[in-house]
Protein backbone atom coordinates (compact mmCIF):
# COMPACT_ATOMS: atom_id res chain seq x y z
CA UNK A 1 0.00 0.00 0.00
CA UNK A 2 1.36 3.41 -0.94
CA UNK A 3 0.27 6.65 0.65
CA UNK A 4 -1.35 9.25 -1.54
CA UNK A 5 0.22 12.56 -0.62
CA UNK A 6 -2.08 15.26 -1.96
CA UNK A 7 -3.62 18.49 -0.74
CA UNK A 8 -6.70 16.72 0.62
CA UNK A 9 -4.56 14.32 2.65
CA UNK A 10 -2.53 17.29 3.93
CA UNK A 11 -5.73 19.14 4.89
CA UNK A 12 -7.00 16.05 6.73
CA UNK A 13 -3.70 15.74 8.61
CA UNK A 14 -3.89 19.44 9.56
CA UNK A 15 -7.50 18.99 10.73
CA UNK A 16 -6.43 15.91 12.68
CA UNK A 17 -3.64 17.85 14.41
CA UNK A 18 -5.92 20.83 15.11
CA UNK A 19 -8.55 18.46 16.47
CA UNK A 20 -6.03 16.91 18.86
CA UNK A 21 -4.62 20.30 19.92
CA UNK A 22 -8.08 21.74 20.52
CA UNK A 23 -9.28 18.59 22.29
CA UNK A 24 -12.06 18.29 19.70
CA UNK A 25 -12.76 14.58 19.34
CA UNK A 26 -15.40 15.20 16.66
CA UNK A 27 -12.91 16.81 14.28
CA UNK A 28 -10.13 14.38 15.27
CA UNK A 29 -12.19 11.25 14.65
CA UNK A 30 -13.77 12.62 11.47
CA UNK A 31 -10.43 13.62 9.96
CA UNK A 32 -8.82 10.32 10.98
CA UNK A 33 -11.63 8.21 9.52
CA UNK A 34 -11.62 10.15 6.25
CA UNK A 35 -7.83 10.02 6.00
CA UNK A 36 -7.85 6.26 6.56
CA UNK A 37 -10.63 5.86 4.02
CA UNK A 38 -8.82 8.02 1.46
CA UNK A 39 -5.56 6.12 1.87
CA UNK A 40 -7.01 2.58 1.74
CA UNK A 41 -9.37 0.40 -0.25
CA UNK A 42 -12.20 2.10 1.65
CA UNK A 43 -11.89 5.09 -0.68
CA UNK A 44 -14.50 3.47 -2.91
CA UNK A 45 -17.05 4.08 -0.13
CA UNK A 46 -16.43 7.84 0.14
CA UNK A 47 -19.19 8.64 -2.40
CA UNK A 48 -21.68 6.87 -0.10
CA UNK A 49 -20.55 9.06 2.80
CA UNK A 50 -20.80 12.10 0.58
CA UNK A 51 -24.34 11.19 -0.45
CA UNK A 52 -25.76 10.02 2.89
CA UNK A 53 -23.34 11.23 5.58
CA UNK A 54 -25.13 14.45 6.56
CA UNK A 55 -28.52 12.72 6.66
CA UNK A 56 -27.19 9.85 8.80
CA UNK A 57 -25.43 12.35 11.07
CA UNK A 58 -28.61 14.37 11.55
CA UNK A 59 -30.52 11.18 12.36
CA UNK A 60 -27.93 10.18 14.98
CA UNK A 61 -27.91 13.71 16.43
CA UNK A 62 -31.71 13.71 16.64
CA UNK A 63 -31.68 10.33 18.39
CA UNK A 64 -29.15 11.73 20.88
CA UNK A 65 -31.27 14.81 21.55
CA UNK A 66 -34.50 12.82 21.97
CA UNK A 67 -33.06 9.98 24.09
CA UNK A 68 -33.22 11.86 27.45
CA UNK A 69 -36.93 12.42 26.80
CA UNK A 70 -37.46 8.74 26.07
CA UNK A 71 -35.37 7.61 29.06
CA UNK A 72 -37.36 9.84 31.40
CA UNK A 73 -34.45 12.11 32.36
CA UNK A 74 -36.37 15.03 30.84
CA UNK A 75 -40.08 15.38 31.45
CA UNK A 76 -42.49 17.08 29.09
CA UNK A 77 -43.92 20.22 30.66
CA UNK A 78 -47.60 20.40 31.44
CA UNK A 79 -49.86 22.51 29.23
CA UNK A 80 -49.18 25.71 31.17
CA UNK A 81 -45.46 25.27 30.49
CA UNK A 82 -46.13 25.47 26.76
CA UNK A 83 -47.82 28.87 26.96
CA UNK A 84 -44.98 30.77 28.64
CA UNK A 85 -43.00 33.41 26.77
CA UNK A 86 -39.80 31.41 27.32
CA UNK A 87 -41.33 28.36 25.64
CA UNK A 88 -42.59 30.48 22.73
CA UNK A 89 -39.14 32.03 22.35
CA UNK A 90 -37.41 28.64 22.52
CA UNK A 91 -39.75 27.24 19.86
CA UNK A 92 -39.10 30.29 17.66
CA UNK A 93 -35.34 29.95 18.05
CA UNK A 94 -35.60 26.23 17.25
CA UNK A 95 -37.54 27.00 14.07
CA UNK A 96 -35.01 29.68 13.05
CA UNK A 97 -32.01 27.42 13.65
CA UNK A 98 -33.58 24.50 11.78
CA UNK A 99 -34.41 26.81 8.87
CA UNK A 100 -30.86 28.21 8.82
CA UNK A 101 -29.33 24.72 8.91
CA UNK A 102 -31.61 23.72 6.04
CA UNK A 103 -30.26 26.64 4.01
CA UNK A 104 -26.69 25.71 4.92
CA UNK A 105 -26.76 22.21 3.47
CA UNK A 106 -27.25 23.35 -0.16
CA UNK A 107 -24.55 26.01 0.23
CA UNK A 108 -22.10 23.38 1.48
CA UNK A 109 -22.91 21.27 -1.58
CA UNK A 110 -22.67 24.18 -4.03
CA UNK A 111 -19.44 25.63 -2.63
CA UNK A 112 -17.60 22.86 -0.74
CA UNK A 113 -14.50 25.04 -0.30
CA UNK A 114 -16.50 27.10 2.20
CA UNK A 115 -16.77 24.00 4.40
CA UNK A 116 -13.03 24.31 5.07
CA UNK A 117 -13.49 27.87 6.30
CA UNK A 118 -16.44 26.86 8.45
CA UNK A 119 -14.43 24.00 9.96
CA UNK A 120 -11.46 26.25 10.67
CA UNK A 121 -13.81 28.77 12.30
CA UNK A 122 -15.42 25.99 14.33
CA UNK A 123 -12.02 24.72 15.49
CA UNK A 124 -10.97 28.25 16.50
CA UNK A 125 -14.26 28.71 18.36
CA UNK A 126 -13.80 25.42 20.20
CA UNK A 127 -10.10 25.85 20.93
CA UNK A 128 -10.06 29.48 22.02
CA UNK A 129 -13.62 30.50 22.91
CA UNK A 130 -14.85 27.41 24.74
CA UNK A 131 -17.36 26.60 22.00
CA UNK A 132 -18.89 23.27 21.11
CA UNK A 133 -18.50 21.84 17.58
CA UNK A 134 -22.14 21.34 16.71
CA UNK A 135 -22.71 24.24 14.39
CA UNK A 136 -21.29 23.71 10.87
CA UNK A 137 -24.75 23.36 9.31
CA UNK A 138 -26.07 26.39 11.17
CA UNK A 139 -22.88 28.29 10.40
CA UNK A 140 -23.37 27.47 6.73
CA UNK A 141 -26.95 28.71 6.99
CA UNK A 142 -25.81 31.98 8.53
CA UNK A 143 -23.15 32.25 5.83
CA UNK A 144 -25.84 31.67 3.19
CA UNK A 145 -27.84 34.48 4.79
CA UNK A 146 -24.83 36.82 4.66
CA UNK A 147 -24.07 35.83 1.06
CA UNK A 148 -27.63 36.58 0.00
CA UNK A 149 -28.41 32.95 -0.88
CA UNK A 150 -31.62 33.04 1.16
UniProtKB/Swiss-Prot annotation:
Entry's Gene Ontology cellular component terms: plasma membrane
Residue ranges of the TM segments: 1-21, 52-72, 81-101, 123-143
Signal peptide: none
Keywords on record: Cell membrane, Membrane, Transmembrane, Transmembrane helix
Membrane topology recorded in Swiss-Prot or TrEMBL: Multi-pass membrane protein
Domain of life of the organism encoding this protein: Bacteria
One Pfam family this sequence matches: DUF441
Subcellular location: Cell membrane
Similarity comment: Belongs to the UPF0756 family.
Protein name: UPF0756 membrane protein CGSHiEE_06715
Amino acid sequence: MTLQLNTIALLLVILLILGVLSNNSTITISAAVLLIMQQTFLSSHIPLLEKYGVKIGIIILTIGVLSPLVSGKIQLPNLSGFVSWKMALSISVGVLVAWLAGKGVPLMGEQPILVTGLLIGTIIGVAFLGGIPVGPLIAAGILALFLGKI
